[in-house]
């Protein structure tokens, strides 16, 4: 059994996701009514309205479960203030395999970074896991999807300021 992944969220992101969840839960009766109306039209095999409503219900329930799990495992708090160390909620500048170019991204969940201009990488991704708790100047190695490995150096870690 795998251990539960804790997700760091600001209070604003938590509130935004909670509002979305409340709205989706409130829409359940509307979708159920659509399904019942379509069901009353007769033959379900060729009932496009029924199938569309069932598909909509499936998407709704999937998102509800996703949000419930995310909020259940959320660690709500302020942006990490510790500069120089890679933590969820930090903006990281990294260099891959001694290349000259650097990349800058937010180490957070997609939900947390949904309103920013930065690329967002999850702390549970291979890159995110490799960089967690790394100090500036430290080089780590992580596994690529194709099975190869890549070295990445943390150039800078700073608190996310929005």
From Swiss-Prot:
Protein name: Transcription elongation factor GreA
Gene Ontology BP terms: DNA-templated transcription elongation; regulation of DNA-templated transcription elongation
Keywords: Coiled coil, DNA-binding, Transcription, Transcription regulation
Family: Belongs to the GreA/GreB family.
GO terms of molecular function: DNA binding; RNA polymerase binding
Coiled-coil regions, chain positions: 50-75
Keyword Coiled coil carried by entry: yes
Gene behind this protein: greA
HAMAP family xrefs: GreA_GreB (MF_00105)
Biological function: Necessary for efficient RNA polymerase transcription elongation past template-encoded arresting sites. The arresting sites in DNA have the property of trapping a certain fraction of elongating RNA polymerases that pass through, resulting in locked ternary complexes. Cleavage of the nascent transcript by cleavage factors such as GreA or GreB allows the resumption of elongation from the new 3'terminus. GreA releases sequences of 2 to 3 nucleotides.
SUPFAM superfamilies registered for this protein in UniProt: FKBP-like, GreA transcript cleavage protein, N-terminal domain
One Pfam family cited in the UniProt record for this chain: GreA_GreB_N
Keyword Methyltransferase carried by entry: no
């Amino acid at each position: 059994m795998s251990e539960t992944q804790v997700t760091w969220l600001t209070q604003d992101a938590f509130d935004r996701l909670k509002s979305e969840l409340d709205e989706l839960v409130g829409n359940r009766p509307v979708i159920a009514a659509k399904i019942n109306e379509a069901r009353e039209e007769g033959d379900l095999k060729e009932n496009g309205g029924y199938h569309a409503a069932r598909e909509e219900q499936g998407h709704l329930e999937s998102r509800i479960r996703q949000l419930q799990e995310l909020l259940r495992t959320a660690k709500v708090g302020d942006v990490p203030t510790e500069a120089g160390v890679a933590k969820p909620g930090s903006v990281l500048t990294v260099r891959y395999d001694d290349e000259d170019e650097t990349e800058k991204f937010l180490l957070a969940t997609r939900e947390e970074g949904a309103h920013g201009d930065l690329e967002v990488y999850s702390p549970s991704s291979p890159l995110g896991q490799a960089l967690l708790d790394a100090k500036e100047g430290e080089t780590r190695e992580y596994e690529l999807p194709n099975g190869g490995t890549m070295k990445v150096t943390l150039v800078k870690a700073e608190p996310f300021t929005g």
